[in-house]
Every structure is written in structure tokens, then in C-alpha cells.
């Protein structure tokens, strides 16, 4: 059993090996990694998703600490996408994370 199978074996028991492989092959974009988006991105990483693109222009500030996963004393002033990307890599080292620090609008699509 390799590290990925050990790390995400619970997902395979829930969705089957085929389901886990679909998650591993998936690429998901999370637009906005604040209060809700950070939780969504972390849940995707913990589910074995193979690639995540994170999009957010904002930086972590002290007032985020009470509700945002990536908001810690040491991440204040850092780009939210960079702080979240680091957290995701610690959870799921095989996940390919692209961090885009920019504002999302119809021109970005």
C-alpha cells in the first residue's frame, strides 16, 4: 500500500477505489478562500483531490483568525491563497496546488 492509499484509505472505503481514483484525477477551482472557501478547499484536499486552483486577491488579517483556517498569527499579511496552499500541501503532499492572487470576474473565465 502506498502513501496515498494509506492517507486516503477511508475515502476508498466510503466511495470505493474507483471513486478515490476519480477524486485523485479531479481538478477543482475554489474562488475565494475566506470563511467558506478555506473550509471547502481543505475538505477537498482531505478527500484526496489531485489538483486545486485557489483564487483570491486578499491577504490574511488579524480579524480573520476567529473563522478562517489559514489565518494564524504567523500568516497575517500573507496572501490567503499562499497560506492555504501551504496548508493543503501539508495535508495532501501529492495535491498539485496553483495559487492565483487575483480578483476573479467575468474577464478571468
PLM segments and residue spans:
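Glycine-rich adenosine-cofactor-binding loop
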Residues: 24-45, 51-56
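N-terminal charged helix/coil linker that caps or initiates catalytic domains
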Residues: 1-29
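Rossmann-fold cofactor-recognition segment
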Residues: 71, 98-99
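Electropositive phosphate-/nucleotide-binding environments in soluble metabolic enzymes
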Residues: 5, 13, 17, 34, ...
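Residues at or immediately flanking beta-strands
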Residues: 27, 96-98
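Glycine-rich phosphate-binding loop and adjoining beta1-alpha1-beta2 segment
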Residues: 49-92
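Conserved SAM/SAH-binding loop
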Residues: 100-108
